């Protein structure tokens, strides 16, 4: 069965996003503690398409670093080996990402979200980025902040030149979801499954 995978660090709102785009049709467990989803969770839509909620990579509350590395390896292996994935949705915390990326860069390391975004492109999963939690960004700072989000992912600002890839949304308030759903419709059509567009209706 064709799949769309959702990947992202722990606690960025992957499960909340699935609940929002399926209008609650998918039975989703949403938790505040990082690392609530610890193995792939499969949400079948009409027995035709599967949304796969991958475990969050990176920090997990109360979980040894060794286990966190195992989870990351599981995600990479899954994405490399599956041949039925249409594309990936890379969910990031738009509010927190620039600061987190800066911390990684200060340590001389590649930010984990940039690494994942590049990996998704390398394995041909044509990622679409859901920059979630924009309700936490002050309107006056929005443009500058989204430029920083783009930069954190390795995309040259201004962010608006990436409107087919980078979507500011709030799974909580619904802001930006119409544009995001329209992009999902376009992606499934492009993948050769126009009939799946009905799963991402805007009304």
UniProtKB/Swiss-Prot annotation:
CDD domains: YihA_EngB. Its cofactor is Mg(2+). Residues 1-190 form the EngB-type G domain. Mg(2+) binds at residues 15, 37. Keywords: Cell cycle, Cell division, GTP-binding, Magnesium, Metal-binding, Nucleotide-binding, Septation. Gene3D superfamilies: P-loop containing nucleotide triphosphate hydrolases. GO terms for molecular function: GTP binding; metal ion binding. GTP binds at residues 8-15, 35-39, 53-56, 132-135, 169-171. One of its GO terms (biological process) is cell division. Signal peptide: none annotated. The keyword Cell division applies. Necessary for normal cell division and for the maintenance of normal septation. Belongs to the TRAFAC class TrmE-Era-EngA-EngB-Septin-like GTPase superfamily. EngB GTPase family. This is Probable GTP-binding protein EngB.
